Amino acid sequence: MFSFRKFLAFMLIVIALMASFSSAQPIDEERPIFMERREASAFGDIIGELKGKGLGGRMRFGKRSSSPSDISMAELRAIYGGGPVEYVQL
């Protein structure tokens, strides 16, 4: 029969083996998932607005007004160090 210490040692070995064969992959391996971007065209914005309206959305032409509390990306980079942008796999 196993003593408690032998059982504990066995469980630690099993856990260590499971951790060494983990299925977690680093970010850069396997196939990264990229977001698809549409090509810019002369009528791309208008077509997008019309599609949105046809699907029950509201039409928004022009730039949205921003509130004074909005912070631009340049200001965020200045505040948080301005390092390179890191992409995260989804």
UniProtKB/Swiss-Prot annotation:
Residue(s) carrying Phenylalanine amide? F61
Q: Which GO terms describe its biological process?
A: neuropeptide signaling pathway
Q: Which residues form the propeptide?
A: 25-36, 65-90
**Subcellular localization, as worded in the UniProt entry:** Secreted
In terms of superkingdom, the source organism counts as Eukaryota
**Region forming the signal peptide:** 1-24
- Main location (coarse class): secreted
Q: Which UniProt keywords apply?
A: Amidation, Cleavage on pair of basic residues, Neuropeptide, Secreted, Signal
Q: What is the stated purpose of this protein?
A: FMRFamides and FMRFamide-like peptides are neuropeptides.
What protein name applies here?
A: FMRFamide-like neuropeptides 27
Organism the protein comes from: Caenorhabditis briggsae
Q: Which gene encodes it?
A: flp-27
